[in-house]
Amino acid sequence: MKQTKPFFAYRSFWKEFDAKKRFASIGVDQFAVFASHSTNSLGEPYGQYDPTWLWYDTYDFTPFDQQVNDVIGLCPEAKILCLIDLNSPLWLARQLYVDSYPAVTLAAAHDRWKEETRKYVRAFVEHAEKVFGDRIICYILMCGTTDEWMDFSNGTDSPGKLRAYREWCARKGLPEPADIPGVAARDHISREHTGMKLRDPVMDHDAVQYWHFHSEFNVETILEFASLVRSLVSRPVELGVFYGYILELAHSVVHRAHLAYEKLESSPDIDFLISPGDYQDRDMGGGSGFMTPNGTVLPRPHPLWALRDGRFAP
């Protein structure tokens, strides 16, 4: 949040009443609440409350209300960091044959997915504002793999993705592509030296251009939903997102659609970014630094939240 004093909040996708009570007892009064309806990387529900998105145009926000009220019962002064689940419920993934969890860019290029997800977000935010607007201090948009806007589709094409790619090229003043580059072209490496893999801007022009689009399209989706949330809230509210993990994803960073972090950080519709600590430096004494390029983030007006979800010695 935009404040000068140190900021600390507690987040757990499970109920964890004892932990929340202990944090409240030491003065922590900001808690994350996630009204989830999607599953995690193990195929299990993210949370321990019932889902809120049940079918087309059918929502039940009672579990969300219960979750917030459970927090208030433990900490009457609680302020809420409200996480919005944009990922597909299992029934929607089966209905549309596209799942935003592994393939957020394919889902975003699917008109029906975007239509239904926008309707859910609208209904959820309107309800949240009506019932808990005086407690909610920010909204955090969650989508893609592990809800962190990562894409594991390896750039797979679809009719909607091709249409979006052509529109992106038109906005950039580039020639209209006949198709999305195939797998061999997308993954081709022209230069390799001491383990470093590089693409030649001439020889690999089509791949470089497509992967540029791949990340920008992901950010455009984030900003579209951020704008929607902003339009539904009549009071000043901050919006955040998990994005920009270029220091963690290593050789897969091009594929994961996290390269357009400067475009996201320059947008007035996003107020802060969130990043876990780096998972490659977890040994005792390690720093477990940020996944994001701090030198780029810090000069900009958007603060960076550090998500501390590492393992600690007993």
Residue spans for each PLM region:
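Extracellular/periplasmic catalytic domains that process cell-envelope and extracellular macromolecules
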Residues: M1-K2, A24-S25, L74, V131-R135, ...
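Short, surface-exposed connector motifs at secondary-structure boundaries
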Residues: M1-T4, D50
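Hydrophobic faces of well-ordered beta-strands that scaffold small-molecule active sites
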Residues: P6-R11, D29-V33, I80-I84, I137-L141, ...
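Acidic-and-aromatic substrate-binding clefts and catalytic sites of carbohydrate-active enzymes
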Residues: F7-F23, S36-L42, L54-F64, Y245-H258, ...
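Aromatic-lined substrate-binding rim segments of carbohydrate-active enzymes
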Residues: E16-T105, E115-R118, V125-A128, E224-L232
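Residues at alpha-helix termini
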Residues: I26, K172, L232, R308-G310
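Polysaccharide-binding and catalytic clefts of secreted carbohydrate-active enzymes
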Residues: R94-R282, G287, T296-V297
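Active-site core of glycosidic bond-cleaving carbohydrate-active enzymes
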Residues: F272-S275, G295-P299, L304-P314
